[in-house]
């Protein structure tokens, strides 16, 4: 009786490894990284978009204002992070599709392409803002640009926080690209 059972098990062959669980886990990790990137990029855009400070000198009539929309690099930063955050929100259904159907390769190719584009957009926005913040903190004596962060401390600190959140979003996006690339590479025979 024992030989008959073992013979029938050999005829069926070995059971395939549970590949679906591993790919589903990668899909869940992809979804969580997207949520973190959404939080980072949208909080960066909102923080920079609400950054302003007013200083009063001598009387109420002399006021100096620092606002994000006075600098085109900060406007670009807000727009770039809003675009990336919007893309990430729109990519969530595709990420959910990768959890439900872990073998869907075409959606991975779509995500890896657009995630790479969003890395570039987010990095360029953050780099532009960092350049302005450097001049705001250090100044430039050759061009007579004075450091304003000693006076507008709250403005600069809020802008630095926004740029830090944006660079965190860049890191999450890079991790998403690497995750999608490794998933696609594992699909090859």
UniProtKB/Swiss-Prot annotation:
Its main location: membrane. GO terms for biological process: cell wall organization. It is found in: Cell membrane. Keywords: Cell membrane, Cell wall biogenesis/degradation, Glycoprotein, Membrane, Transmembrane, Transmembrane helix. Disulfide bonds: none annotated. Residues 1-25, 95-108, 180-189 are cytoplasmic. Residues 47-73, 130-158 are extracellular. One of its GO terms (cellular component) is plasma membrane. It is a multi-pass membrane protein. Belongs to the Casparian strip membrane proteins (CASP) family. This is Casparian strip membrane protein 1. The lineage of its organism: Eukaryota, Viridiplantae, Streptophyta, Embryophyta, Tracheophyta.
